[in-house]
């Protein structure tokens, strides 16, 4: 099981969900974790940072390549603490939470991908 990327409560789940702002149904490819502003975002496993910048709709984003086609994505950050090409270790602080996405509250949007396919992070994260 993987460690959690941030302490907080899951407020939006993987799969088909009603969007709180647009009142439509969307297929969520990750989860939203409500956290205190400025909470440290931690890499869930070792890897190489392949993206760390603004992405429309996601705000400040960090994407880590964990090899063998496995990626993690961390969005809505208020601050990025890493850069493209940097090798990170499990548990390393890579950013701080914020509200730079479209949700309008302080959350971390967290996604796991196996190849091009999103997978439910809650199936991979340690139970708590």
Task: Tell where the protein language model's regions lie, with residue ranges.
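Zn2+-dependent peptidoglycan hydrolase active-site motif and core
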Residues: 43-78
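Feature marks short, surface-exposed loop/turn motifs that line or immediately flank catalytic pockets
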Residues: 18, 70, 116
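Short, acidic/hydrophobic/Gly-rich beta-strand patch recurrent on exposed beta strands
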Residues: 22-25, 31-34, 61-66, 109-111
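Extracytoplasmic/periplasmic cell wall- or extracellular glycan-interacting regions that localize
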Residues: 1-51, 56, 119, 125-128
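Conserved, short, structured surface segments that act as functional micro-motifs
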Residues: 62-63, 84-128
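Conserved positions in beta-strands of structured domains
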Residues: 11, 48-50, 78, 95-98
């Amino acid at each position: 099981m993987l460690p959690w990327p941030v302490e907080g409560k899951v407020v939006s789940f993987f799969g088909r969900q009603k969007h709180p702002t647009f009142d439509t149904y969307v297929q969520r490819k990750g989860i939203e974790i409500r956290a205190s502003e400025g909470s440290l975002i931690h890499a869930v496993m070792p890897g190489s940072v392949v993206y760390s910048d603004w992405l429309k709709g996601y705000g400040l984003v960090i994407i880590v390549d964990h090899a063998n086609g496995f990626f993690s994505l961390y969005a809505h950050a208020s601050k990025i603490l890493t850069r493209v090409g940097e090798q990170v270790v499990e548990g390393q602080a890579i950013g701080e939470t914020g509200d730079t996405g479209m949700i309008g509250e302080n959350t971390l949007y967290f996604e796991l991908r196996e190849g091009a396919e999103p997978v439910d992070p809650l199936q991979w994260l340690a139970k708590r």
